[in-house]
Amino acid sequence: MTSIILASGSSIRRDMLQNAGLDVEVQPARVDEASIKSAMLAEDAPPRDIADKLAELKSLRISQKNPEALVLGADQVLVHAKRLFDKPEDLSEAREHLELLSGQAHELLSAAVISENGKPVWRHIGRAQMIMRPLSAPFINAYLAAEREGVLETVGCYKLEGRGAQLFSRVQGDYFSVLGLPLLEILGFLRARGVLVE
């Protein structure tokens, strides 16, 4: 049976795959995301290309060490007003992000690349439009106090499957892509490859 490796340390991505019935091994890929993003932004690369490139590099890094496995690399970027957001470094930066995104729409792009034998064999980018409601200062204070360092784990300072749902008035697009993986498309590929029963 073909083994599946997740080239990510994300517990959310791991849980999504395992909850969908997949037996996955986790091997986080170490790539210099900041340098790659910076270089691509300097070349005016669109955000979708940045997410796709990071997912591909993670997938390839682990695939080269595990050529017989299907290796899934993933990356998510948040775009607002032509600005690419990174995960906040601390709670002060998380507050700034929430204040900037408050009452605004932003887009999440979740890229996934599967490699085998050191080559990409499948890729997909899921999209979601996130409409954040206007957030009051007391709400932001209470939210950050409740979520604490958990907001530093995600690019948008929220987990939609938890308290982060309170930030939004509307979400358009794929729910799983909001969580960080275009799960349904991944499952479709695995069925087509015979890894999952059709």
What role is predicted for each listed range?
Residues 1-70, 138, 145, 184, ...:
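N-terminal polybasic phosphate/anion-binding patch
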Residues 15, 83, 149-150:
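Non-catalytic structural scaffold of enzyme domains
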Residues 123-197:
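Active-site oxyanion/phosphate-handling segment shared across diverse enzymes
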Residues 17, 55, 75, 94, ...:
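Residue-level signal for inorganic ion chemistry
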Residues 79, 113-116, 133, 170:
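Short beta-strand-to-turn element immediately C-terminal to the catalytic PLP-Schiff-base lysine
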Residues 76-106, 132-134:
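Active-site-adjacent loop/tail segments of enzyme domains
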Residues 23-34, 113-119, 153-165:
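Mobile beta-alpha loop/short-helix "lid" or hinge segments that flank ligand
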Residues 97-99, 110-123, 127-128:
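Anionic-ligand binding region
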